[in-house]
From Swiss-Prot:
PROSITE patterns: RIBOSOMAL_L3 (PS00474). The keyword RNA-binding applies. GO terms for biological process: translation. It comes from the Bacteria. SUPFAM superfamilies: Translation proteins. The gene is rplC. The keyword rRNA-binding applies. This is Large ribosomal subunit protein uL3. It holds the Pfam family Ribosomal_L3. Part of the 50S ribosomal subunit. Forms a cluster with proteins L14 and L19. Residues 126-150 are annotated as: Disordered. One of the primary rRNA binding proteins, it binds directly near the 3'-end of the 23S rRNA, where it nucleates assembly of the 50S subunit.
């Protein structure tokens, strides 16, 4: 059985539980995906399948050949598989392969926030708001020592580019699936903004 699926983040909403409490959920339009390549231990050194998702406007000849006539896919991703012998090129993967209450890992690209200061990026407290201070409210303060060590240590928290990086959130719970609309309702938040491509894998697989 294939252990993952590719999808697109639709947005967030909420559903009400039996006790009346509102539960925030993320809607993911997952699949349908098509198996475009099967990788075996003998030929590739490991076992996995490559899935295709979404329709591409423009596609290179190399990718077109790799898709082998099953469609012109916008996204190609590899996922693990339990039994490689049970999978063949052209198989379709849908949300029906996931069950309510199942745990998943969601990977995507986080929203970019540009060049951010230390208060936003690293949650610094900032300087004093009074007692004669000026222009210190969101300043980082001291960033190192003097002659010794005579440099700034690697990894020092400073202002810089924030977001727009690969993020994986583990152990999320699938609350509900909708096979007709290809929707997964996932408890909590998932990386990225609207229409972000999300790779969903079953936890521990």
């Amino acid at each position: 059985m294939i252990q993952g699926i590719i999808g697109k983040k639709i947005g967030m909403t909420q559903i009400f539980q039996e006790d009346g409490k509102a539960q925030p959920v993320t809607l993911v339009e997952a699949g349908p995906c098509v198996v475009v390549q099967v990788k075996t231990e003998k030929q590739d050194g490991y076992e996995a399948v490559q899935l295709g998702y979404g329709k591409a406007k423009h596609i290179t000849s190399a990718v077109k050949g790799q898709c082998r006539g099953f469609g012109e896919f916008k996204v190609l991703r590899e996922v693990d598989v339990d039994d490689i012998a049970a999978v063949s090129v052209g198989d379709q993967i849908t949300v029906s392969d996931f069950k309510d209450g199942e745990k998943i890992d969601a990977s995507g690209v986080s929203r970019g926030r540009g060049f951010s200061g230390v208060v936003k990026r690293w949650h610094f407290a900032g300087g004093p708001k009074t007692h004669g201070q000026s222009d210190r409210h969101r300043a980082p303060g001291s960033i190192g020592s003097t002659t010794t060590p005579g440099r700034i240590y690697k990894g020092k928290h400073m202002a810089g580019h924030m977001g727009n990086e690969a993020v994986t959130i583990r152990n999320l719970v699938v609350l509900k699936t909708d096979a007709e609309k290809n929707l997964l309702m996932v408890k909590g938040a998932i990386p990225g903004g609207k229409n972000t491509i999300i790779l969903i894998k079953k936890t521990g697989k």
